[in-house]
From Swiss-Prot:
This is Uncharacterized protein McbA. Induction: Repressed by McbR. It is found in: Periplasm. Its main location: periplasm. One of its GO terms (biological process) is response to stress. It comes from Escherichia coli (strain K12). Belongs to the BhsA/McbA family. GO terms for cellular component: periplasmic space.
């Protein structure tokens, strides 16, 4: 029982630390506090939620603190771009 509790606590704490460093979606109004640092693009998503997840992951990989999705489109395969901010 004690090992299960320890494992549960470790899992929760590791999840908290990962979300603290994840790039967050922003509105254009929020972006005034940060500087644009480039763009990221993603393709091959099956829906808009998957596309947003792919763009967020690419923004995080670039060290962004936030991102604004500029474009999204497609039918069977979604594609999109986002401006990243640091």
């Amino acid at each position: 029982m004690k090992k299960c509790l320890t494992l549960l606590i470790a899992t929760v704490l590791s999840g908290i630390s990962l979300t603290a460093y994840a790039a967050q979606p922003m509105s254009n109004l929020d972006s005034g506090q940060l500087r644009p640092a480039g763009t990221v693009s993603a393709t091959g998503a099956s829906n808009l939620s998957d596309l947003e997840d792919k763009l967020a992951e690419k923004a995080r990989e670039q060290g962004a603190k936030g991102y604004v999705i500029n474009s999204a489109g497609g039918n069977d395969q979604m594609f999109g771009t986002a401006t990243i901010y640091k």
